[in-house]
């Protein structure tokens, strides 16, 4: 049994060499995340070049995800680099201040905060480790009282409990970073803090314009991090190609206890709308410093797999941790074990579904046929990857091999659950193409003489969205 759930790993100082990256890819990485919150444009271009070269060396399809920083709202710097907030003491956030902060006051990089808050609001600093209660707003100053204290250092983030900050989803920096990401033709572009579908539509338009010189359009991932995004989940998903359950900032805004149920809801909705889902944040956090995960982390990864997520993501664990390779190995092993335990059946929400497209109906027909016949594999000849995406929405333990003539489609499909993307030559004749596809799978050891498999393709060949044929074959 091969692993169906994909692994997204973030590059950083701990994994920024071809040697380490190669071992991570061999250990199970399917998508490499470039975090645009850190580093310069050339750093990301160099890393993308490295990813392409190492993936080619390993002989594996690896996608690149460019993750935009978004409107991070932060305090400024302090005279001594940090202060200690004491519960019950006053503390001022000053949007006009240009001097370094001290024990009583701090500057802000977000000038609209005084307009966005009111007395009684709760502000959370440093990912919720520090809590302030707003007492008053006087001009550009937000006067607060420390509710939960601790150390506050330079440039730590600020969230408002329950949402309500009006910062736009796309900043000037993001717009420049989109141009950089398009220059190396990332397969996925992740947008931070979208509030609604309009934010995603704007990001897609900017990406498509920036990608025009390269004839490239990335798939768009919406990072669900804001309280305001929750009522608009369906619209955001429909305007995107997938979502990231970004549990860090989301938990700060909605509360830790609300996140597990939201995670399940988002993954289920993504599958129903034929979108991909990535589960992220602190999945193997202890492995930043420890060689093995905690039992709680093992359960967290396994439960995300059982929820039906397409991918589980590593952030600081592979970017800055001591054990990047071991973390990937552990995550791959956990995912595989969870998949063995899955109760596999044809989901009723898909079984009773009607389809308005021939290619989508063929994709679903292949799944049902393979499931009931006990086929060894499903082969999908696809130009754009849509057929493989539809197949991957259904949890089934029959492996899906997606064969395409398009390298960009091959890499994009690296994120799809239970899909093994392969590159094949272009054929105009359908029967020649079908025979070539079988030969590729036999040579890889995925099919043996006597095995049955379901195969889909379109006729005429080579047209995206043209899948109109399903055939069951036996290997001679």
Locations of the language-model features?
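Non-catalytic helical/linker scaffolds that mediate oligomerization, partner binding
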Residues: 1-476
